[in-house]
Amino acid sequence: MITLIAAISTNNALGKDNDLIWRLPADLKRFKKVTSGHHILMGRNTFESIGKPLPNRTSVIITRNNNYKKEGCLIAYSLEEAIAFTEGKDAFIIGGAQVYKQALENNLIDQLDITRVHQEFEADVFFPEIDSTVWKEIYREDFLADEKNVYDYSFISYQKI
């Protein structure tokens, strides 16, 4: 199964200046838990913002640069090639905005795992609208802000209809 995983705000903001806009420790903990042991597929800018391969995951970087190399990572020149690296095993598309858009437009994913941050943010990259004629909410858990997580948020899973 190919799952797209993203944290987005109420106004679908993803990030600004190639970085996350907010810090939400519960989301990072969940991301680590669900992606651990799997392939994670990402664009080059997303990888560069992380800075290194994440532990206990196979990092696949999608780039148009034929000379791009990163130790400890697989390099793909298209999203389809990145998916082929997974050899049919569960994998997660972790960004960025262009990769998300391509995956959604080309019907390459089976599930969406979304952390919805209940706040609007100024951003320069946004997540596409989730089309309710294509995606059905199958799981939702809502949380109020607390001492560690300063925003209300929800973990929501969608399955293709």
Predicted regions and their residues:
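Enzymes that bind and transform nitrogen-containing heteroaromatic metabolites
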Residues: 1-161
